[in-house]
Amino acid sequence: MRTLTTSNLEPGMIAAEPVVTPLGQLLAPAGTEFTRQLINRMKLYKVESAIVLGEGPRDTDVEAEPKPAARVKTHAEKSKTHSQKVAASDEFRDFQMQYFDAIDYLRNVFTSATTAHYTIFVDALVNSVSDLFRSRNTIVELFDMLFNMRIISDSVYSHCLNVGLISRMIGRWLKLNKHDLNILTAAGLLHDIGKIKIPEEVLNKPGKLTDEEFAMIQMHPKYGYDILKNQSIDPRIKKAALMHHERSDGTGYPSHLTEEFIDSFAMIVGIADVYDAMTAARSYRAPLCPFQVIANFEHDGYQKYNTKYILTFLKQIAAAYQNNRVILNDGRGCNIILLNQTALSKPMVQMDDGTIIDLNTNRDLYIKSVI
């Protein structure tokens, strides 16, 4: 093995160890072949060097002791969580590379769109993420991948990418035609473009925002609309940037619109936006599991969101996890066996001893995590 500066890396070399950013974000796992794209991404993330496999006696030393490592790995495999198994899969490795490619493209669109005479091409934008949704037809498959990407990348760009993908999934459930699916996907991808006008120290502040800082954040929908308003793109994309924080009951921002004045795509993107935010880790809380998010939506979502859109979303999310193994808040594991249509966050579960518990009638119990 040998250490090379990023500028001396060449396509075809193999990473001997994971490639990580100065902030600890994984760019590529060990064993990845360096491509020109990956090397450029390393420069973008200010990764100064990498350890690569190379000629020499140390390579022999590295390969001379595979058996003990293999035995440890086999033992560890037995105790891996579902998330860890996903992260170790070839499918996730492919998804990860496609995801970073999409992030790079989206970052370029965001920064370029603030300059004069830049044209956003919706077809190219949607095509930049097409590999991420074409081969993943179920919400569980997609969310498994997105959950593991959070550990690696949790930026405005990754959030917008997630919202674009989730919005498209909702559009599929609503049986939108392909053209509208593409417009909805683009609306999700661009919904937070206005945040590029917000100082990073405010966007990434770990603690509670001051009133002044929160007021600054609340300007991002208007900033986004201002960036997009002169683009020759579908008006629904512009409206999604402006209205995705509006709520049906008039409690949203920036204009406190009620449902009849909110664009339908903005309402769909708003649901995807909140779901992605709730399932992300924050300095003040751990990420919420899907059933905790459903419970939050059930608590106040029916009046804040379009009924058709929110019920379609919640029913599909809950149904996707039927028969999954989950952990309750008291630490016990069980399997979801039947959904409660009037309380989707409180399904019936079967314990390991065969006992069936209706969480809707056992109000002290709730699903804490999906495994």
What are these regions (language model features)?
Residues 59-61, 189, 206, 246:
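Short secondary-structure boundary/hinge segments and terminal tails
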Residues 163, 183-197, 215-310, 319-321, ...:
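Alpha-helical scaffolding flanking metal-ion-dependent phosphate/phosphodiester catalytic sites
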